[in-house]
């Protein structure tokens, strides 16, 4: 990798240069794997962190300046710690504190990247996300799992509520494509050891734990006890990830990054090759998003794309783009209608009804612990006791509501303060960089602004801030935006 990509303070010694190279290599691996695997991408972040540490030892400096975000981030972390200590279930909530490490990506990106290296990483992220979108299309054509036609009375799969018409697509971490595949996988499990079954039922994907085979069932020629010959071609796409909701949120943010870069070039240079490449990538990523049939995330994407278009396009371009967004909504509606419960478009499906019931119970319990909340993940131990319906949800499906419930109303105020601060800062930075000489920085900031907008809209009805892969991507993009703006501002100061 060219040393021109590095911040200048990394060239002071061989040790600092080595650390910078390791850190940048770790971030390259992260963006390549972030749309697909949390374990591999988290490992890449650890490698990048080690590189940052080596560079710090070589330079004697973290390479960070104070920012306007530091205070609210520190206060949020401290409040989260206090909430965990005062939780209804301290042992569970304290163990959950490890999820707060995602904010490390914000400071890592700020310390390691400049606007040029940020552009390279964004480009790699878009390429990797596009590969995931293409795989989703292939996965839909190929089909997934096995559709249950008949289930025997003595089938162990009754333990997890399997019914005719359901699709079994995963046992533990292994994907299933036929009854023979299912039987072979069950025979590889240990008798008496519970495993989790991935199921698609009425268009909804759930993971149901608790399947246990007896030694006698384990020895049967067909331990599954089901008959089925077809794969499911009408499931909610999830790429190489485990769940469609995670995949949808990631596709949404990456698609808006690509769109921001494309429309920045369209505004400043017309329909050049960079615009064409970016708009093709954005279209692929949008297709991957729509195939998840996530109603709220599709709507959030359209809102985020609308913000990007409104701030970058003029005249006829706005009209054309508005029609394109209506097409996305219409196509999304068709996919939702084909994939999910027929009443999903009118919010009359069981999933929507359950969400409303859960939200009402959650709201009614916030006054019980309004300051420090009930504690992160404490509801998993008291779901039925506290009056929540069902057994598959186990969270409130709303980031603001979940934060208030888990960590108290002050945490919700801190989160709103932080989100508003990010939005206003990135919006001002994008506006000031909208000139011919800084198109790529403008595109990154514009795309990040759209991604942040969509993330916030989606957060109203999805607990996306509690999804580790999505939270990592959120903090990484905020770090890229801060790094791009800081590097751009320093360059402008030097030129003046």
Feature locations, PLM:
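Transmembrane alpha-helices of multi-pass inner-membrane enzymes
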Residues: 24, 47-53, 254-257, 261, ...
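Hydrophobic alpha-helical transmembrane segments
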Residues: 80-84, 117-144, 198, 202-226
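A conserved mid-to-late transmembrane alpha helix and its immediate loop/hinge
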Residues: 238-246, 363, 372, 392-426, ...
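Transmembrane signal-anchor hairpin modules in multi-pass inner-membrane enzymes, especially those
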Residues: 1-92, 102-105, 111-123, 165, ...
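Hydrophobic transmembrane alpha-helices and their immediate junctions
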Residues: 262, 272, 409-453
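Hydrophobic alpha-helical segments of polytopic membrane proteins
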Residues: 105, 112, 258-337
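Long extracytoplasmic/lumenal interhelical loops at the membrane interface
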Residues: 222, 232, 337-339, 345-360, ...
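A membrane-periplasm/extracellular boundary helix in multi-pass inner-membrane enzymes
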Residues: 127, 134-144, 283, 291-292, ...
């Amino acid at each position: 990798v060219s040393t021109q990509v590095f911040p200048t303070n990394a060239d002071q010694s061989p040790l600092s240069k080595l650390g910078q190279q390791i850190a940048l290599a770790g971030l390259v691996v992260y963006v390549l794997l972030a749309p697909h695997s949390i374990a591999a991408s988290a490992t890449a972040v650890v490698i990048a962190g080690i590189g940052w540490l080596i560079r710090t030892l070589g330079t004697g400096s973290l390479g960070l300046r104070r920012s306007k975000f530091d205070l609210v981030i520190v206060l949020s972390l401290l409040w989260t710690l206090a909430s965990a200590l005062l939780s209804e279930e301290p042992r569970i909530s304290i163990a959950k504190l490890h999820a707060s490490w995602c904010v490390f990506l914000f400071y890592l990106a700020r310390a390691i990247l400049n606007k040029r290296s940020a552009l390279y990483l964004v480009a790699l992220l878009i390429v990797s996300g596009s590969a995931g979108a293409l795989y989703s299309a292939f996965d839909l054509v190929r089909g997934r799992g096995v559709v249950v036609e008949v289930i025997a009375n003595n089938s162990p799969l009754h333990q997890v509520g399997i019914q005719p018409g359901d699709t079994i697509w995963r046992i533990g971490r292994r994907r299933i494509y036929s009854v023979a595949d299912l039987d072979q996988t069950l025979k590889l499990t240990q008798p008496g050891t519970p495993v989790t079954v991935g199921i698609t039922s009425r268009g909804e994907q759930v993971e149901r734990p608790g399947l246990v085979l007896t030694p006698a069932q384990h020895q049967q020629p067909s331990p599954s006890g089901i008959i089925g010959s077809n794969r499911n071609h009408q499931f909610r796409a999830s790429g190489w990830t485990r769940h469609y909701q995670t995949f949808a949120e990631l596709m949404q943010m990456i698609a808006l990054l690509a769109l921001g870069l494309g429309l920045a070039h369209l505004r400043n240079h017309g329909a050049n090759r960079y615009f064409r490449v970016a708009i093709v990538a954005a279209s692929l990523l949008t297709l991957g998003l729509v195939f998840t049939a996530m109603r709220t995330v599709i709507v959030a994407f359209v809102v985020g794309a609308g913000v990007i278009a409104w701030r970058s396009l003029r005249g006829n371009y706005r009209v054309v783009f508005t029609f394109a967004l209506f097409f996305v909504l219409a196509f999304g509606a068709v996919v939702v209608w084909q994939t999910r419960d027929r009443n999903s478009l009118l919010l009359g499906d069981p999933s929507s009804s359950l969400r409303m019931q859960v939200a009402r119970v959650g709201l009614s319990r916030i006054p019980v612990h309004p300051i420090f909340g009930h504690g992160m993940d404490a509801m998993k131990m008291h779901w039925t006791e506290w009056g929540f319906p069902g057994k598959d949800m186990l969270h409130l499906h709303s980031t603001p509501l979940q934060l208030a419930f888990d960590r108290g109303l002050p945490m919700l105020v801190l989160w709103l303060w932080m989100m508003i601060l990010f939005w206003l800062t990135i919006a001002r930075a994008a506006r000031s960089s909208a000139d011919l000489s800084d198109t790529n920085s403008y595109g990154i900031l514009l795309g990040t602004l759209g991604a942040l907008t969509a993330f916030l809209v989606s957060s109203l009805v999805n607990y996306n801030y509690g999804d580790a892969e999505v939270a990592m991507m959120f903090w990484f993009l905020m770090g890229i935006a801060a790094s791009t703006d800081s590097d751009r501002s320093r360059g402008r100061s030097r030129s003046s």
